[in-house]
Amino acid sequence: MKPSMRSRLEQLAHRLIEVDALLAEPETAADMDRFRKLSRERAELEPVVEAFNAFLGVEADVATAQEMLSDPDMKAMAEDEIKTGRARIEEMEAALQLLLLPRDPDDGRSLFLEIRAGTGGDESALFSGDLLRMYTRYAETRGWRVEIMSESESELGGYKEVIARIDGDGAYGRLKFESGAHRVQRVPATEAQGRIHTSACTVAVMPEADAMSDIVINPSDLRIDTFRASGAGGQHINKTDSAVRITHVPTGLVVECQDDRSQHRNKDKAMQVLAARLKDKEMRERQSKEAAERKSLIGSGDRSERIRTYNYPQGRVTDHRINLTLYKLQQIMEGDLDELTGALLAEHQAEQLAALGHDL
């Protein structure tokens, strides 16, 4: 183990002792905010320190076995113990490296999913609906709740734009690499000649902002307009001005919500989406800078990047960032995303490990 890595682990072990002492103080129990903060820190430290202590135990066993090599009666057994112990040390060191990776503080959050039809007209809008269904099915398998926040339906079905909230522990951490351009190649239902068309949709995955601390929105920066809600084709479906459009003047971000009959609830939903978009904007700017420094392919924050192709005639899904091709398109469109999301997370961890090795 590198001395710098050992030193870092020793610091964390010492910090766990400090945190336990602080949690035992009456003053901490009286201050709930401080108690919660220290409890969260302890929950993060404990698995790392436990793994490090187990590593030290195996290391000590190997050292003891090495001392036994000079005893002819014990030499064979000692050699076996050393061989087994060194293999375990290698495995445990790799596991400790993963535990030391910096954690995204947003990984445990719920998220907002925004899908927009792009090139391809009606076919693109239909594919937007297919993508929403895919993510909804995936959320259901994980026990997450999906709520439509805003939708603009296409006349032939699907969506010109749809925003959904996916509520569940760890939702953002699992789906955060879905942002980007999704391309579909298939024969549209409206195509009489049987020709394959190519169209695309843009997906944005944004962590839900903590209203209390993440984003401060100055009311004077907002322009709020109300209007009558309309359905597919533009016809008005509500006689009252229940729909809400909020413009954040400094950034030009615009959010519309018209799904609820209550103007107040539409305004609340629009403010939630606006806060998530502002947080997302800050995060993408930071990711773009970090990606340029690290030459990262995953999580660059670039929404225009074509990340995935869904080829229906071949039953193929290809993720271009990691050159992964899976011939299980039907299962994926039914929400079987674990292999894709798992591969992206593994690649991200590999990039983090490379950076950690450089930093240690």
From Swiss-Prot:
Positions carrying N5-methylglutamine: 235
A cellular-component GO term for this protein: cytoplasm
PTM text: Methylated by PrmC. Methylation increases the termination efficiency of RF1.
Gene3D superfamilies: 3.30.160.20, 3.30.70.1660, 6.10.140.1950
Main location: cytoplasm
Localization terms from the record: Cytoplasm
The keyword Chaperone is assigned to this record: no
SUPFAM superfamilies to which the protein is assigned, alphabetical: Release factor
UniProt keywords, alphabetically: Cytoplasm, Methylation, Protein biosynthesis
GO molecular function: translation release factor activity, codon specific
Keyword RNA-binding: no
NCBIfam families (alphabetical): prfA, PRK00591.1
Protein task: Peptide chain release factor 1 directs the termination of translation in response to the peptide chain termination codons UAG and UAA.
UniProt family annotation: Belongs to the prokaryotic/mitochondrial release factor family.
The protein's name in its UniProt record: Peptide chain release factor 1
Primary gene name: prfA
